[in-house]
Amino acid sequence: MSCRSYRISSGCGVTRNFSSCSAVAPKTGNRCCISAAPYRGVSCYRGLTGFGSRSLCNLGSCGPRIAVGGFRAGSCGRSFGYRSGGVCGPSPPCITTVSVNESLLTPLNLEIDPNAQCVKQEEKEQIKSLNSRFAAFIDKVRFLEQQNKLLETKWQFYQNQRCCESNLEPLFSGYIETLRREAECVEADSGRLASELNHVQEVLEGYKKKYEEEVALRATAENEFVVLKKDVDCAYLRKSDLEANVEALVEESSFLRRLYEEEIRVLQAHISDTSVIVKMDNSRDLNMDCIIAEIKAQYDDVASRSRAEAESWYRSKCEEMKATVIRHGETLRRTKEEINELNRMIQRLTAEIENAKCQRAKLEAAVAEAEQQGEAALSDARCKLAELEGALQKAKQDMACLLKEYQEVMNSKLGLDIEIATYRRLLEGEEHRLCEGVGSVNVCVSSSRGGVSCGGLSYSTTPGRQITSGPSAIGGSITVVAPDSCAPCQPRSSSFSCGSSRSVRFA
């Protein structure tokens, strides 16, 4: 550190004091504190003027460089400086000699850092990046708020859905009861159909017995018909034999007639040739023609009566056989129709029974499936409820994390706002000081874990560098904690309080 002081006195009783002080903080130092006691020069005499210049430079990689000037005016004298402003006692109202200090002719080595503008530019870029990060944090907070609203909407929807799902159990129970009643009805129908099937089977057995009896009667009738046909054939053969005998007898009678006629003619010829008178007793009176005619008539009568009786008997038998055949055929046809009808009824009842059995099996399967689906739905609902509760718990945890991050982001935003306001205030104070000039300022730069206060407003932060300045133009002090750009981003806690000291501390 270098410090120079100059004193100039004029002949008109005006004394000017000039001082120069430069301080360079170590490069790797973590805490640098430079303080300058304020000079409160008060003089009621004329011609007192003081001027001071001080340069503070911290060449560390993470710290800022700050140059501060102070001004304090009295009633008749002015002084400039950090440590001790030029103080001059009251001078007598006489002409004094002028003394020139040759050392003032040498150029002042203010040791102004040429990289100060670059450092300021870097600080501006850091502020811009911090603002960008803050905007990103704000967007993230908005996105997380949207996600929170979405999760709340989902949670309300799932709660409503849970209420809807709670009504599924009575619905399933009612449906199962309906299926059970239908199954009972099907069982009753199956019992009724089984009794009807037994009755139909009994009727079928009766019809089968009747059919067998009719078949036996038909076989008996056919046997009788065969016997009658044999009798008819025998009668026809007998008739043929009789007709043949009749023809033979007719031929024989015709032969005998011709023979007798020839004998009679021969005898008549002999008789005509001889005249013999014979007297004989012909009491027998045998007339062959009458006998033959009578026999022939009797034979014809017997033959005609036999033919008529045979024909009538044959016709009657044929009519009886035809009637029997027609009757048995009609009975057989009706029996066949009844058998076909019974077969169709049996097939229909069998199909209905099979259909009832299939329907019963389907209903039992449907009841079992409905019970399984109900159990599966209930288990699925329980699983979904557990998942939703887990998701709700996770959402609450995520919400807590998001709220924590949001609080951290808001803390970062608040710190950045305070930092920006502090930098703006420092710049405005520096410009005001350069334009008007004020008293001396105490500046303290430190790196610590502390809080920030601004006009009674305190704010606690993470470890950083603290810059403390002494009395300002408004009669207060400014304390600034600059964020350590090399430190990792960590959660920060904050608190604010207001007072009269007008100190600012930010992270």
UniProtKB/Swiss-Prot annotation:
Instruction: List every stretch annotated Head.
Output: 1-123
**Which residue ranges are recorded for the region named Linker 12?**
270-286
SUPFAM superfamilies for the chain: Intermediate filament protein, coiled coil region
This protein's record includes keyword Ubl conjugation: yes
Tissue specificity comment? Synthesis occurs immediately above a small population of matrix cells at the base of the hair bulb and the trichocytes lining the dermal papilla and extends upward through the matrix and ends in the lower part of the cortex of the hair shaft.
The UniProt feature for the cross-link Glycyl lysine isopeptide (Lys-Gly) (interchain with G-Cter in SUMO1) gives its location as K229
Q: Write out the ranges of the annotated region (Linker 1).
A: 159-168
UniProt entry keywords in alphabetical sequence? Coiled coil, Disease variant, Ectodermal dysplasia, Hypotrichosis, Intermediate filament, Isopeptide bond, Keratin, Ubl conjugation
Gene Ontology cellular component list: cytosol; extracellular space; keratin filament
Family membership: Belongs to the intermediate filament family.
Which Gene Ontology BP terms does the record give? Answer: epidermis development; intermediate filament organization; keratinization
Task: Name it.
Answer: Keratin, type II cuticular Hb5
* Subunit composition and interactions: Heterotetramer of two type I and two type II keratins.
Region of interest: Tail:
431-507
Organism of derivation? Homo sapiens
Q: Which residues does the UniProt record annotate as the domain IF rod?
A: 123-434
Q: Which disease is it linked to?
A: Ectodermal dysplasia 4, hair/nail type: A form of ectodermal dysplasia, a heterogeneous group of disorders due to abnormal development of two or more ectodermal structures such as hair, teeth, nails and sweat glands, with or without any additional clinical sign. Each combination of clinical features represents a different type of ectodermal dysplasia. ECTD4 is characterized by complete alopecia, hypotricosis and nail dystrophy in all digits. There is no evidence of any other abnormality. Inheritance can be autosomal dominant or recessive.
For the keyword Coiled coil, the answer is yes
Please, what other remarks does the record include? There are two types of hair/microfibrillar keratin, I (acidic) and II (neutral to basic).
Domain of life assignment: Eukaryota
**Residue ranges, annotated region (Coil 1A):** 124-158
**GO MF assignments:** structural constituent of skin epidermis; structural molecule activity
Q: Region Coil 1B: which residues?
A: 169-269
Annotated region Coil 2: the residues are: 287-430
